[in-house]
Amino acid sequence: MVASTHELFNIHPGWLKLFPDEFAAAFAIVESLQSYHPNKDYVFKVFESDPESVNVVVVGQDPYPTAGDAMGLAFSVSRSEKLPKSLQNLFKELQSDLGITRTDGDLSDWQAQGVFLINRVLTVPFSHANGHKNIGWEDFTEKIIRYLGERGAVGLLMGKSAEEMAKYFSKKVITAHPSPLSAYRGFFGSKPFSAVNALLAIPVKW
């Protein structure tokens, strides 16, 4: 069952070798749900990457609850118009930090460079932020994050939920979350992108 399901979700086989039981449990969570974001095909999109290619781990909370926003990568959307506020703020800080102006909300190019954009919770009910908290996702994603951190990846941890994972990273950048509620409480001016690049042998082209 695991093999056929992983093919359906386009998960890199390296993850299945590392965490066969954990993925079986994660697939069961998805099958138990009715209506949720992102689309089922995108729930495990972050795992399309080879685990050996991951150099940076960006930890989010859960997918965007608005229809059409979530696409399986933390903070990312599949379009360039009407970006969510958190992503707008992320891009404002990117401009301030590195002088990079970005309007494309699809962060797949970051993923292609070894940036692992994972939410602690991989699904969300329609229009109900954090509505799938404590249904099993946190245990699954914590094991993944721990593996990557202990393997030497740099952690970019924005917000309290992400900061809970700090213990697994020897190299990390911790800042406030870019949401409108907290962006002015430590995120703006934190220069997280240059800070992450300073910890890498090959910097990310944000």
Regions found by a protein language model. Give the residues of each.
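Short, Lys/Arg-enriched, disordered terminal segments
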Residues: 1-7
